[in-house]
Design a protein with these regions (language model features):
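N-terminal "arm"/small-domain region of PLP-dependent enzymes with the aminotransferase-like
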Residues: 1-55, 143
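Phosphate-binding glycine-rich loop
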Residues: 62-102
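Short, conserved active-site loop motifs that form the nucleotide-linked donor/cofactor pocket
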Residues: 79, 175, 200-201
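Glycine/small-residue-rich loop that forms an oxyanion/phosphate-binding "nest" at active or ligand-binding sites
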Residues: 84-97, 161, 179-183, 187-188, ...
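Conserved PLP-anchoring active-site segment centered on the Schiff-base-forming lysine
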Residues: 95-116
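Short beta->alpha connector loops at strand-helix junctions that form conserved
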Residues: 107, 126-130, 205
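Active-site phosphate-binding strand-loop segment of PLP-dependent enzymes
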Residues: 125, 130-185
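PLP-dependent aminotransferase class I/II
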Residues: 200-273
Length: 273
């Protein structure tokens, strides 16, 4: 099979965390939420009309997008959703990182970034953290084809201040800067506050951590309308039906239960402290 692309031959795939079949295990390998989903999610699932599963889901995920719009105070046209934030991020790599210049991300960070870069033939550069495992904003003032980093970073757990994020964004106006906020609800401010003045900023979040829905695979991106329209265009070019109907309804229900979300997130923060 010599026709296989070289980048596919050499790619080293991300290794997902094991899901043990035995009970009574304290499982820490994938940072799953120890608390169950919101009771409102359980109610939606228990009362789901299974006859609707014969139909394809809403490709626009309207119920979920509209609830995200209310929750975060943004226009629905500023929202893109996918099958977990990994799906959203992979679509971002395909859509925005198309330059012959390297994409920049920390050398100690989420290990999927270089996997996607290798798979999609995207040049990249791992930027070293400083001696205290912090991201040095000055290191991102160089020629690049895009920037991505988690905030807080994983696995260090160290977060950048919003002023530092804005410094990176403003210094790279010709590049898309993606802030991966998988753990943002456990200890730092969201870069969503910076969207109004920064059209090259994209913020990605997930329902897997703070909303206890890792098993349903729901992620989303929020950014300026033009960037979001490009994400939908790429997505609909190869798979128009991503989120299933149950995930869309359950995700919307989780967003409506703000009290439960805040309580469980604070419980986890207090446990860590």
């Amino acid at each position: 099979m010599s026709s296989w692309k070289d980048n596919v031959r050499k790619v080293e795939p991300y290794v997902p965390g094991e899901q043990p079949k035995i009970k009574n295990v304290i499982k820490l390998n994938t940072n799953e939420n120890p608390y169950p989903p919101s009771p409102k999610v359980e109610e939606i699932i228990k009362n789901a009309d299974c006859s609707l599963l014969r139909k394809y889901p809403d490709p626009a995920c309207s119920e979920l997008v509209n609830e995200l719009s209310k929750t975060y105070g943004v226009d629905p046209d500023m929202i893109f959703v996918g099958v977990g934030s990994d799906d959203v991020l992979a679509t971002c790599f395909m859509t925005f990182f198309c330059s012959d210049k390297p994409v920049l991300f920390p050398d100690v960070t989420y290990s999927f970034y270089d996997v996607w870069a290798e798979l999609f033939n995207i040049p990249y550069e791992r930027v070293p953290l400083d001696g205290d495992f912090n991201i040095n904003t000055a290191d991102y003032r160089k020629e690049n084809g895009g920037i991505i980093f988690p905030n807080p970073n994983a696995p260090t757990g160290i977060a950048l201040e919003l002023s530092d994020i804005e410094e990176i964004v403003k210094a790279n106006k010709e590049s898309v800067v993606i802030v991966d906020e998988a753990y943002v609800d456990f200890g730092t401010r969201s870069a969503l506050e910076l969207l109004d003045k920064n059209e090259n900023l994209l913020v990605v979040q997930t329902f897997s951590k703070s909303r206890s829905l890792a098993g349903l695979r729901i992620g989303f991106a929020i950014g300026h309308k033009e960037m979001i329209s490009y994400l939908w265009a790429v997505r609909n070019s190869f798979n128009s039906y991503t989120l299933n109907s149950l995930a869309t309804a359950a995700g919307a229900a989780a967003l409506r239960d703000k009290e439960y979300f805040e309580k469980t997130a604070n419980d986890i923060i207090n446990t860590r402290e």
